[in-house]
């Protein structure tokens, strides 16, 4: 029963999050830009070195998957992208424009919807 409740809650959160992302063009652009520039290292699934490194660093205290994080700030995302961190390279404005970086920032710092955010049918 608990497992079914957990699965139902996860499905609700994902569908509500998708609905809100579709309503926000900046978040959609951020998703597409993240998939193009960042997902090779920071995507979901095995074989993504950034995700693996962050999971090892945080040891379960925070998710290794950036898209699942709730603690990211716009300033932190911009800093990491423009200056690089550890083995992550920095990205120039000619690679990721300021507008694209703003979209990535909006995508990664979006918050999951609450019940009041989701429109009832």
Predicted regions and their residues:
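Gly/Gly-Pro-rich "capping" loops immediately C-terminal to redox-active cysteine motifs
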Residues: 31, 43-79
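Bacterial N-terminal signal peptides
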Residues: 6-15
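The canonical Cys-X-X-Cys-His
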Residues: 30, 34-45, 104
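Electrostatic cytochrome c docking/interface patches
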Residues: 17-35, 48-49
């Amino acid at each position: 029963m608990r497992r079914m409740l957990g699965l139902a809650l996860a499905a609700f959160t994902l569908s509500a999050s998708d609905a809100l992302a579709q309503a926000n063009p900046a978040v959609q652009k951020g998703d597409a830009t993240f998939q193009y520039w960042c997902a090779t290292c920071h995507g979901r699934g095995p074989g993504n070195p950034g995700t693996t490194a962050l999971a090892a660093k945080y040891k379960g205290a925070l998710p290794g998957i950036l898209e699942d994080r709730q603690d990211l700030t716009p300033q932190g995302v911009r800093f990491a992208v423009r200056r690089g961190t550890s083995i992550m390279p920095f990205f120039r404005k000619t690679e990721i424009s300021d507008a694209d970086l703003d979209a990535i920032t909006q995508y990664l710092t979006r918050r999951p919807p609450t019940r009041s955010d989701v429109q009832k049918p």
